[in-house]
Amino acid sequence: YSAVMLGYSSVDEFADTNSLLVDAEQLFPKGSIELANLKLLSAISIEDCILMAASLSCQSGSVLRSTFYKMLRGKTELLYPVESYIYEDGLGLSGWIENKRVLLGTRELMENHSIDGLPSEAKEKEYTNGNVAVYLSISGITAAMFVIQVSPNLSVTRWLQELELEGITTVIRTVDGFLSQRFLSDLFDIESDSVKLLSFRYHKDYESETEYVPRQASSMLC
């Protein structure tokens, strides 16, 4: 992404900018997020676990979407239709697929829904080995743990740090519970108060503000 300021009027218009809206997917270009391990935690097949998690991720716009796309080798026709979903702020996704309640997110999400079959925190630490645990539950049972390796992109890190220096807050739309302010500040080496996470109730407002329009004011071309 790039931008061009067209004249002094553009400088006047944007001089007081104090925040920037961005989708979390833009912070993690291809190769930033990889599947490090997959731990089955129930009798549910690995294929069903992958398809359920991939379906919910792809429908919601999760940063894990490209990771699952890679696992499916681009065969999106295999995905299940998602009947509905919501993002529980700071926790993860809750949706309905094939008349089954499917949760995808943090350990806290599972605990909040009293999901059975979670491994102990000691076991989780052993399985993840410093990476991120994303849990999948199907119909009230912990089905699998996806161990995710997240690496900061150098150019993204640089512009987030530059925005911080300019006093501009990056407001992030995400549906991934593990992307907390603390996680992002540690990952990109910025202060935690330089990023804010957009609550799910404002996601439709975000979409209306950032949707494509055929015409735009000439003060800035992006």
Feature map (PLM): residue ranges:
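Juxtamembrane coupling segments of multi-pass membrane pumps/enzymes
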Residues: 1-11, 69, 77-78, 199-205
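ATP-binding catalytic core of ATPases
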Residues: 39-90, 111-114, 120-124, 175, ...
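A glycine-centered beta-loop-beta connector
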Residues: 25-26, 96-101, 136-141
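Conserved catalytic phosphorylation-site environment of P-type ATPases
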Residues: 1-54
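A generic structural motif
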Residues: 35, 108, 149-150
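Cytosolic beta-strand hydrophobic patch enriched in CBS
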Residues: 21, 93, 132-138, 172-173
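Short, small/polar residue-rich loop motifs at catalytic or cofactor-binding pockets
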Residues: 14-17, 89, 128-130
